[in-house]
Design a protein with these regions (language model features):
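Glycine-rich phosphate-binding loops of nucleotide-dependent enzymes
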Residues: 2-5, 9-282
Length: 282
């Protein structure tokens, strides 16, 4: 196990690159003077759930933004189904099968559940451009039932739903949009235990079906071990650990964070001492 970010990470290599639906190699990204990502490499297999861990500012959200087409990397390569992946934007990434659920969910509160499920993909009657509300309701109900989301009324405004239900609707929209890979940016943020369990159950059902692969940012180690097949921990823009959840533990994940905190504190103290010595204060 690594005892600092600067040491060699524990990385479990895939059996074959052909197993991967998504592969990232040596990704780097600078945000102004800050290096957000440094030489990030990871992979995602079909039907796999990958949990991303790391402190605030570690680089997790930056990685998600690059994968989703919201930002461009400065260096490195990405491959989707074995082909070079260079999204020109979020819409381009979505058209290639990668969709993202951010913390704000991008739902329109005033619209109904079924309208939100078909947002920007509305069904219309032809040749007259009238919304096919009946067809959208039927398809929305089918889509929700297929992944086990219990929303009694799909004509109600999403503003009236709970946080867990809203998150579930946002996830269902990506599945309904034929996404192969779903990126979840802190799906359990600000949720109670009951609503969080609802989302974890949804992820478990999607994993069992094996139709989509999922990358999600989490902060709770127990949730990661419960919901994910594999975990990648990012510390200061580098991979500090990448291994199957069955081969790690809460204790190991905690040790990595504690060791990094100690390393950072020692560096701060050393820098302060060097500065004081240069100023003749020691």
């Amino acid at each position: 196990m690594p005892d600092a970010v600067g040491s060699e990470p524990e990385v479990v290599q895939p059996t074959s690159a052909s197993d991967d639906v998504l592969r990232v190699e040596h990704l780097s990204k600078r945000c102004g003077p800050v290096t957000a990502l440094r030489d990030i490499s990871l992979h995602l297999r079909k039907g796999e759930v990958l949990g991303l861990l790391g402190d605030n500012g570690a680089g997790k959200s930056t990685l998600i933004k690059i994968l989703s087409g919201f930002q461009k990397q400065d260096g490195g390569e990405m491959f989707l189904h074995g082909e070079p992946y260079m999204p020109k934007g979020v819409d381009d990434a979505r058209s290639k099968g990668i969709d993202t659920v951010y913390q704000d969910l991008a739902l329109i509160d005033e619209l109904s559940v079924y309208h939100n499920l078909f947002l920007r993909r509305e069904l219309v009657h032809k040749p007259l451009p009238f919304l096919a509300n009946r067809e959208m309701k039927l398809q929305a109900r089918k889509a929700l039932d297929e992944i086990g989301i219990n929303i009694p009324r799909i004509d109600v405004a999403v503003a009236r739903l709970s946080g867990g239900q809203r998150q579930a609707i946002a996830v269902a929209r990506t599945v309904n949009g034929d996404a192969d890979i779903i990126l979840l940016d802190e799906p359990l943020a600000a949720m109670g235990a009951k609503e969080g369990s609802m989302i974890l159950d949804l992820v478990a059902r999607l994993k069992e079906e094996g139709k989509v692969s999922i990358i999600m940012i989490l902060h709770n180690y127990v949730h990661v071990l419960q919901a994910c097949d594999r975990v990648s921990m990012i510390q200061e823009g580098v991979i500090a650990l990448d291994k199957p959840t069955a081969e790690t533990s809460v204790e190991e994940l905690t040790d990595i964070v504690v060791n990094e905190y100690r390393r950072a504190r020692e560096e701060t103290h050393a820098a302060a001492a060097a500065h004081a010595g240069a100023e003749g204060l020691l």
